[in-house]
Amino acid sequence: MEFAGGSLRLGAERGEERFIFDNEKWGHDVELAPFAISAFPVTNAQFRDYADDGGAPPRYWKKMDGEWRERRFDRWQPLEPDAPVRHIDWNEGQAWCRWAGRRLPSEAEWTCAAGAMHWGEVWEWTASTFAPFPGFSADPYADYSQPWFGTHKVLKGASFATPCRLMNNAFRNFYMAERGDVFAGFRTCRMDP
């Protein structure tokens, strides 16, 4: 999906009738260059091709009788080829992107495209480091966001396990780059020409 770029309002707006975390405050304008983003997250089949070409498989995959299987709770099940790959850490997403000649989207690019793309099956890694928005002020529980600025990566979207009240494209999830236990996957952008 191609986007022309331009100005984007990133973050929550005052007066929204939902719970807003301190790291979503407040909406501010960012400028985006034109970009192209995948309509869907990277699938098991796409990641399987990478693993078959020598890339590291996800931690919950194992080859059995010549076929990749995925651990789901206490069972090894055949991969669903069209399902988004999950339990991928940020570094694994970056490695796949290098292999495929793609890149992770920025938080702003993902947010810009959110209204036009399918999301909500897995949290999606972005290229963006978790940082405060301009004018950030910690909520009374200061340890929710502030200690993690600069050391975590932003994930956008939601997973099947996300409560409905948190499912909106302004929500900013964040984890350390090596966390692969999260229901996380990724989508990609075309490399800039």
What does each model-found stretch correspond to?
Residues 31, 35-113, 190:
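Active-site microenvironments of metalloenzymes and redox enzymes
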Residues 22-28, 52-60, 117-193:
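Surface-exposed recognition segments
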